[in-house]
Amino acid sequence: MRKIIVGSRKSKLALTQTNWFIDQLKALGLPYEFEVKEIVTKGDVILDVTLSKVGGKGLFVKEIEHALLTKEIDMAVHSMKDMPAVLPEGLMIGCTPKRVDPRDAFISKNGASFKELAEGAILGTSSLRRSAQLLAARPDLQVKWIRGNIDTRLRKLKEEDYDAIILATAGLQRMGWDNDVITEHLDDTLCVPAVGQGALAIECREDDKDLLQLLAHINDTITERTVAAERVFLHKLEGGCQVPIAGYATLTENDAIELTALVGSMDGSVLLKETVVGTNPEEVGLEAADRLIKQGAKELILAANKEQQ
């Protein structure tokens, strides 16, 4: 019986996601056993700076990918939105389980909705994507950066001067906390989700054919296709955490992919948005990127990167 070593970050959410996925594999009843190896990433250690200032995408995966390449672990369970657009040579996303709710969750201290927040209220987020879109809707709000895992951020909302914070609904759902803490779900027309938000990425070595066959049992083809379109768009624009960028794709009734893609200025004064429909994930992602580039997306990205330096 083969033992599969599964890499995970140490946070409660990461371990919850990892153990959930292992349970899906165990339920297949195949001759494998599993062991979780906890790995500390750079993103877990650097908590006093915004993600965009310390390298953005890849902060939560590099050490785990190193463990995959050196065969310390066999696979890793990541949040898809943490994954860089390009993976190291020899590694691949071997499985995308069914996506859960991709929306952002708005959590306020006193139960006020986003529209009801007082003028000048303080909104906590560590995401340029969220801050740009929400400032576009409410330029009067003050954005204050907030870092840490889910429980840390919820504690900071209670104890510090934040009036509200934004978290991913998916993480709260996986922890079983969504019904207790969420004031409202932000509609994706107000705040387009991050590329891959709500989805998991199971990363493994390309040459591990045995493991890839096992992972195929849990793969969700709809999630795989829609997330692929989002990630192609992200790759074409070379966007990471350093720029307000968003992409969310769904499957239409006739099996076409509908991708809404967005690039914004840091302060939310400019939001470029396009929706593309097609059958090929790569073509849809590239078309969305090309349309936004024609609107001036590259210039916005350059400006955002300069502001971060």
From Swiss-Prot:
The modification S-(dipyrrolylmethanemethyl)cysteine is found at residue 241. GO terms for molecular function: hydroxymethylbilane synthase activity. Pathway: Porphyrin-containing compound metabolism; protoporphyrin-IX biosynthesis; coproporphyrinogen-III from 5-aminolevulinate: step 2/4. It comes from the Bacteria. GO terms for cellular component: cytoplasm. Pfam families: Porphobil_deam (PF01379), Porphobil_deamC (PF03900). Its EC number is 2.5.1.61. Its cofactor is dipyrromethane. SUPFAM superfamilies: Periplasmic binding protein-like II (SSF53850), Porphobilinogen deaminase (hydroxymethylbilane synthase), C-terminal domain (SSF54782). It catalyses: 4 porphobilinogen + H2O = hydroxymethylbilane + 4 NH4(+). Keywords: Porphyrin biosynthesis, Transferase. Belongs to the HMBS family. Tetrapolymerization of the monopyrrole PBG into the hydroxymethylbilane pre-uroporphyrinogen in several discrete steps. The porphobilinogen subunits are added to the dipyrromethane group. Monomer. This is Porphobilinogen deaminase. It comes from Bacillus cereus (strain ATCC 14579 / DSM 31 / CCUG 7414 / JCM 2152 / NBRC 15305 / NCIMB 9373 / NCTC 2599 / NRRL B-3711).
